[in-house]
């Protein structure tokens, strides 16, 4: 019998090499936990980065709003004046049309 066949038989008959070690399920669980932990840390990092970016953007928006505050108020006042002017013009036009209609119906 060749020597290598003897070593193969010896290896196969030894129980510790033939059957999976009892720590294999533990290793698989640890591997799965490591994958989960790694993915979870990535997600937490992305959430933190997103929150930081939103905070920075809201601060910048707040600064812009403070700078634009007087301009916005002035714009609203101008819009209000135009609306009042338009309403007065429409009321004048409507009054003129009513007068013309009453003259036409009388005559």
Swiss-Prot record:
GO MF term (any one): neuropeptide hormone activity
Gene Ontology BP term (one): growth hormone secretion
UniProt xrefs under PROSITE patterns: GLUCAGON (PS00260)
Family listed: Belongs to the glucagon family.
Broad class of where this protein is predominantly found: secreted
GO cellular component, one term: terminal bouton
Gene: GHRH
Positions of modified residues (Leucine amide): 74
Keyword Signal: yes
Role this protein plays: GRF is released by the hypothalamus and acts on the adenohypophyse to stimulate the secretion of growth hormone.
Localization annotation: Secreted
Residues that make up the propeptide removed upon maturation: 20-30, 77-107
Source organism (scientific name): Mesocricetus auratus
Signal sequence, renumbered to the chain: 1-19
Protein name: Somatoliberin
Keywords, sorted A to Z: Amidation, Cleavage on pair of basic residues, Secreted, Signal
InterPro entries (UniProt xref): Glucagon_GIP_secretin_VIP, VIP/GHRH-like
């Amino acid at each position: 019998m060749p020597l290598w066949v003897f070593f193969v038989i010896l290896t196969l008959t030894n129980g510790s090499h033939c059957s999976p070690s009892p720590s294999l399920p533990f290793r698989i669980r640890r591997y799965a936990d490591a994958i989960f932990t790694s993915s979870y840390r990535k997600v937490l990092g992305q959430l933190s980065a997103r929150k930081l970016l939103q905070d920075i953007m809201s601060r910048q928006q707040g600064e812009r709003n403070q700078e634009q505050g007087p301009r916005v108020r002035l714009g609203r006042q101008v819009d209000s004046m135009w609306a009042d002017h338009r309403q007065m013009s429409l009321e004048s036009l409507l009054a003129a049309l009513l007068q013309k209609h009453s003259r036409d119906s009388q005559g």
